Amino acid sequence: MTPLVALAVLIAAITHASWNAIAHAIKDQLLSFTLISGGGLLIGAAMTLFAPFPAAAAWPYLLVSAALHVAYMMLLMRSFTLGDFGQMYPIARGTAPLVVTVLAAVFVGERPDGWATAGVAVASAGLVGLALWGIRGSGKRPHWPAIVAALGTGLAIAGYTTVDGVGVRASGTPLGYVAWLMVLEGLAIPAYAYYRRRAELVAQLRPFAVRGLLGAALSVAAYGLVLWAQTRAPLAPIAALRESSIIVGAAIGTLFFKERFGAPRIAAAGLMVVGIGLMLHTS
């Protein structure tokens, strides 16, 4: 992984944590994710007007990925409804890197070398440490339905990361791929919200429109950067490096949601930094 690719993934991590924090801050999660999905749909539709059309070989991956992204959004919405940001976000993000490493090795034939493997393992240990501290440090008993939803979110992340890693390479155009992905995945949650809220939906969305659309723009930018990176580096290190967003999420939780950071999170963040350094050793 080159420094430029690593920088792109780190920017994506910051952007991703930011849009997740915006989503969590809107208390009605159905409204929050309707705005983010619907905003992504509008942005993606605009991008299709000038982005190259993805190659035919990419479309099976686009369709599967869109379904996985919808599942991811629904599970993330449920985990944010049931649990605290400082617990749910690291569990969801921390599950993905090791699963992606296995999936990429089995289905894509990308077997990481020793440095990358060590980096993924150490970074993932840091992520798991942050997640466990979120459970134990909160002073609350674990809320298992929320944790299961967060784990399911992580599995969905691993699934679409692997699918998109193959699909974007087959597409010939990362920009066109992300544009059509946003269009395909952006229909489901707004349709579900309309089914649930009917005529009241527009009035309920209006107070949160600016924040929600900002979250949508950040979401598209974050994943576009990741897709570009996946055309230039193996999937597993990108997945692990992307999850440095948990450090940003912990900082956001401390500053804006008044959650404690503490020594355990600092130690876990240190493991993340070591893991990132090991992954970059291969560049």
Model segments located where?
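Membrane-interface interhelical linkers
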Residues: M1-V64, M73-F85, A125, L132-A149, ...
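Hydrophobic/small/kink-forming positions within alpha-helical transmembrane segments
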Residues: A13-S18, A45, A66, V70-M74, ...
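Hydrophobic transmembrane alpha-helices of multi-pass small-molecule transport proteins
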Residues: G38-G44, T101-A105, W115-G134, P264-S283
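Hydrophobic alpha-helical transmembrane segments in multi-pass integral membrane proteins
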Residues: G44-P54, V100-W115, L155-A170, L218-L235, ...
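Specific alpha-helical transmembrane segments that line the substrate/conduction pathway
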Residues: V64-H69, T81-V128, G176-L184, L235-L255
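Flexible, substrate/cofactor-facing loop regions flanked by secondary structure
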Residues: G152-M182, A188-Y192
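Interfacial loop-to-transmembrane junctions
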Residues: L205-P207, A251-M272
